């Protein structure tokens, strides 16, 4: 009986670790953000080639006031799209597939883990005050 409890405890620990990493690792996501930082800032509400990404998770698409979005992104935001984790995941995988006509010059991230890590990192950054 003790052996069964020990085995079950081990399985539960492994499952909890797997579930935590399925949600992404913010530290790895911060490192992955270097691929985004040529165009985006995440620690300051300024724009570069792209809009800042402070508080992006939960923000309506195309809503950073001082950024000139493509017509496609403005349209997407006007239709009510919000940057949920699922929408971000789809956009990071293939921007032009989710928002045809977007001006984002990025072909997408290659790995589901990298996308999950990046989203986990972006969730840690609050919206500007």
Give, region by region, the residue ranges found by the protein language model.
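Electrostatic cytochrome c docking/interface patches
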Residues: 16-33, 129
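Sequence context surrounding c-type heme c attachment/ligation sites in exported
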Residues: 26-34, 46-54
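Detector for the c-type heme attachment site
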Residues: 40-46, 58-59, 93
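A short secondary-structure junction motif
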Residues: 56, 60-63, 95-99
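Bacterial N-terminal signal peptides that target proteins for export
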Residues: 1-11
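C-terminal capping alpha-helices of c-type cytochrome domains
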Residues: 82-129
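Short Fe-S-cluster ligation motifs
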Residues: 65-82
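The canonical Cys-X-X-Cys-His
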Residues: 29, 33-42, 118
């Amino acid at each position: 009986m003790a052996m069964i409890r020990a085995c079950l405890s081990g399985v539960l620990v492994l499952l909890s670790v797997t579930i935590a990493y399925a949600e992404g690792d913010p530290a790895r996501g911060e490192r992955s953000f270097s691929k985004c930082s040529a165009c985006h800032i995440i620690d300051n509400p300024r724009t570069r080639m792209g809009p800042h990404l402070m508080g992006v998770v939960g923000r309506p698409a195309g809503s950073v006031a001082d950024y000139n979005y493509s017509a496609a992104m403005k349209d997407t935001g006007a239709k009510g799209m919000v940057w949920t984790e699922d929408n971000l995941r789809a956009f990071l995988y293939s921007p032009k597939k989710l928002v045809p006509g977007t001006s984002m010059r990025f072909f997408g991230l290659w790995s589901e883990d990298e996308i999950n890590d990046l989203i986990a990192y972006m969730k840690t950054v609050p919206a500007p005050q």
